UniProtKB/Swiss-Prot annotation:
Transmembrane segments: none annotated. Belongs to the acetyltransferase family. PAT/BAR subfamily. PANTHER family: N-ACETYLTRANSFERASE, UPF0039 PROTEIN C11D3.02C. This is Putative phosphinothricin acetyltransferase YwnH. InterPro entries: Acyl_CoA_acyltransferase, GNAT_dom. Keywords: Acyltransferase, Antibiotic resistance, Herbicide resistance, Transferase. SUPFAM superfamilies: Acyl-CoA N-acyltransferases (Nat) (SSF55729). CDD domains: NAT_SF. Disulfide bonds: none annotated.
Amino acid sequence: MTLRLAEHRDLEAVVAIYNSTIASRMVTADTEPVTPEDRMEWFSGHTESRPLYVAEDENGNVAAWISFETFYGRPAYNKTAEVSIYIDEACRGKGVGSYLLQEALRIAPNLGIRSLMAFIFGHNKPSLKLFEKHGFAEWGLFPGIAEMDGKRYDLKILGRELS
């Protein structure tokens, strides 16, 4: 696996990986697939201090991605970021998530980040386990906040102090 900053040419692969998680109702609150055009503003909104990275497999294909995003958009929160990790279906369960989260924890202090947060559905046990394994703790809970297919789901906020 090779990690590098995302480039415009990666947008379709990033969106395809994102869309592959929608049907499970475990990862994102989007309920229908999105297009690269739908995600262009989000993609372009990544900056030097809040970047988007892609992980390439040995064949140079985008296998996963990590996004650092501004939390809440107020100056007092500038040292806090939300981290998101998305992994291609073929690469799940193979340690890619651990690799990406370790890289995120390594990179974040260089971006001026002191606190990392992740928003994870309460029923997404694999993601909760991954983040907890890497020192994240539950910082908050929004009970029943998401409704998909007539069912309500909790959203957990996990966080970790880096310094």
